[in-house]
């Protein structure tokens, strides 16, 4: 990552939003899996709450961030590069009832980076091994930009974009739609990492697939659900374009899982 410092700084600006689940779940005596942990910033904040009798996994495959997570070893954090390693640990430690602690899977600002197949696999992992699944990510509700505002918003983007070349590249790749307009406003300022950011589908989280598990058939309960407009992003967009973002940009979700039989969860 070209500008990892800038990436981490903007991630930490939304730390309060990422810790929303602390008001709804007691982490004492639980196994915590932080999927896509980056530099371990979320882990550090959770550790400050002094949870008792927990095992904390940071999962991160970026080499630079992996090393940062490893620095938390003295606090009891275990750093691994993938879900498979955690799966093996869970199978070993939960076999024959050796460890009956509940398992919490945290997916904070990471699901949008995954392909649909990988997202499905992560949700399947949560069904097989977890008692709770926590998701916080970007969100766009279909058609939430009103028809009468679409033209005005697009004109402001074209006239006021700080990098017209990058703006043109983005819409060439994404096409022109209300959803792509909303996505551009989320990412236009991340110039230093643009070659990576432009290809990430910010609004690619399959919330419908995740919500499938609230049906009685699979026995999943929604503990908490919230959709909102990120105030930091909304302020930045208004200052740049004079556009008021009166649509949701992010979602927060906590699911209480009923585990299925552990087979091939993919």
Predicted regions span which residues?
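Conserved class I S-adenosyl-L-methionine
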Residues: 30-38
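A short, conserved alpha-helix within the catalytic core of class I
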Residues: 114-126
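A conserved beta-strand element that flanks and buttresses the S-adenosyl-L-methionine
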Residues: 106
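Short alpha-helix
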Residues: 201-221, 225
């Amino acid at each position: 990552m070209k500008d990892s410092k800038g990436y981490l700084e903007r991630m930490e600006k939304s730390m309060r939003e990422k810790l929303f689940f602390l008001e709804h779940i007691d982490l004492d005596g639980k196994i915590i899996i932080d999927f896509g942990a980056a530099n371990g910033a979320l882990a550090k904040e959770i550790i400050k709450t002094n949870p008792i009798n927990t095992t904390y996994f940071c999962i991160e495959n970026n080499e630079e961030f992996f090393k940062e997570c490893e620095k938390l070893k003295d606090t009891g954090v275990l750093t691994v590069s993938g879900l498979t390693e955690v799966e093996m640990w869970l199978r070993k430690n939960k076999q024959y009832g050796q460890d009956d602690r509940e398992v919490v899977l945290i997916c904070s600002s990471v699901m949008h980076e995954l392909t649909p197949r990988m997202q499905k696999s992560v949700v399947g992992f949560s069904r097989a091994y977890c008692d709770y699944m926590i998701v916080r990510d970007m969100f766009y509700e279909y058609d939430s930009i009103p028809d009468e505002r679409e033209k005005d918003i697009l004109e402001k983007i074209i006239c006021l974009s700080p990098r017209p070349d990058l703006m043109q590249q983005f819409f060439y790749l994404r096409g022109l739609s209300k959803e792509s307009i909303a996505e551009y406003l989320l990412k236009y300022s991340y110039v230093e990492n643009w070659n990576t950011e432009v290809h990430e589908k910010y609004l690619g989280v399959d919330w419908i697939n995740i919500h499938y598990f609230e049906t009685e058939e699979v026995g999943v309960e929604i503990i908490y659900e919230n959709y909102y407009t990120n105030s930091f992003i909304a302020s930045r967009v208004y200052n740049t374009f004079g556009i008021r973002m009166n649509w949701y940009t992010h979602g927060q979700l906590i699911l209480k899982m009923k585990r299925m039989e552990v087979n091939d969860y993919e």
